[in-house]
Amino acid sequence: MNILRLLLVASLLTSLVTTAQENDEKLDALVDSVVAAYGGDALLELRNVEIKQRYLAPNTGQSWSPSLTSIARSNQHLVHDMESGNVYSENWFIGSGAVFPGLTIVNGDNAWALNLQTNRYGDAPSADPYVIAGGTMRTSDVLLAHELHKSRADAEYLGEAFWNNRRHDTVKMPFPSSPDLTLYIDTETGLITRMVRENPQFGQLDYVFQDHTETDGLMSAQRVNFSIAGAPNLLGVSREVRFNQPLSASLFELPPGFEPEGERIDTSELVVNRLSKNVYHIGQAIGYSIFVDTGSEVIGCGGYPGLTQRLERFREESGSHRPLRYQVVTHHHSDHLGGIDEALNLGATLVTVENTVPAIEAASQLAPESSRFLNVNSRMTLGQGDGRVELYDVSTVHSESNLLFYVPSSRTLFLADHFGGPYAKGTPTANANTVSMAQALEPLDLGFRKIVTAHNARVYSNGDFEDSLKSYRDYDCPDDRPMCSQ
């Protein structure tokens, strides 16, 4: 009997080893076919890439109204010198009646975030090319093929799949500063036609590559579309890709006429702002919450993922272990709903406006009952005394409904998405959202003295807000920035 068991185990182990060997052989052959399909030596000797991409951008989960998806434009210009690691990453978002520019330059160990509206610059959050430009890199099937070759020892053959009415092989591969990617490789052509990866908050992200043509000796998709959980997010309109072209060193240098912005706040660890004895602003990176201890319970606002961790830090700092009774949801945008299930698991009632409830229900995995919601009609007061919180529903160009969270005892206003910046000092750059929020605040006459936000670590004064508004200028596409206007 024991001999029989040993034989069965040995047979099973042999089968597993054989299968693993077969998959390794398939993977090697598949990677070789991808390299050949994309240009062979031309791919292996890739030195630099330049991508100019224009998209239509359905504002999935980010529209002005939760009931209608608005359409914006998103234009991207990436130059990546793979030999030096230098990066030029220019982005333009044109929507909500305004232009939102972004430019980051990486030059060796230096990395700068440039404000094209004010001609000022500060340190970028990282000098890692994959952190700065990984999002655009993943839209290039050529760069995916190049990374697959580099990481073949760590890649995994997953099996066959049927995609877009054609046979494919699927491979899981690592990608720097990202969850693993799954590539769909056309079995006949060796070309990558799809890539998927998982986002812990938004679900499956899909990249679809079409219309492959030869450019500078390499095959490259001329049309790229990107979807979030099955909903279109970026729809390719035009795409120009060049490889191994001469690059000017000046492209990766600070342009003339830019002045330093100041020191960036370190948000790599949780930041704690004590606003008064019972009011705290706590967060990390780009997700922050405000907590108010009413004396019998806690009222919170700011719904990025990590809410539980922020609440625990509040309890450590304040010594208050009262329950989170209310979690205020500012608006329907999907990035602000990532902590919804944490709030529900903590036992909180979700305070919001009626038209935000469907977005919350869609974002939650817990199917919250109607009793877990408390809807605001124009305005509402929670708590009393030093723990009094006033909520006001206002409309701006950013969102049809925005709940303002105001604490009269500390004269503190909590905002999401309308104001702020990453720097410790100086005047934050106002945009159309800021101006629209100021117009909504004026008739409320709140008398706030401090502003904290859902995305920034700094505590702002009302003077910072006023200075930002005074420095605001309408911003249109500059003549010397064709990626914006075309």
Task: Tell me the role of every PLM-derived stretch.
Residues 235-295:
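Zn-dependent metallo-beta-lactamase
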Residues 22-29, 105-180, 187-189, 199-200, ...:
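Flexible, processing/modification-adjacent segments and terminal tails
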Residues 438-486:
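Divalent-metal (often Zn2+) His-rich catalytic cores of metallo-beta-lactamase-fold enzymes
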Residues 22-23, 27-120, 154-162, 305-306:
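N-terminal mature ectodomain segment of secretory-pathway/periplasmic proteins
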Residues 272-315, 402-421:
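Conserved beta-strand hairpin/beta-sheet module of binuclear metal-dependent hydrolase folds
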Residues 163-252, 408, 416, 421-422, ...:
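Gly/Pro-enriched, hydrophobic low-complexity segments
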Residues 307-351, 445-447:
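Active-site metal-binding motif and surrounding structural segment of the metallo-beta-lactamase
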Residues 7-15:
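Bacterial N-terminal signal peptides
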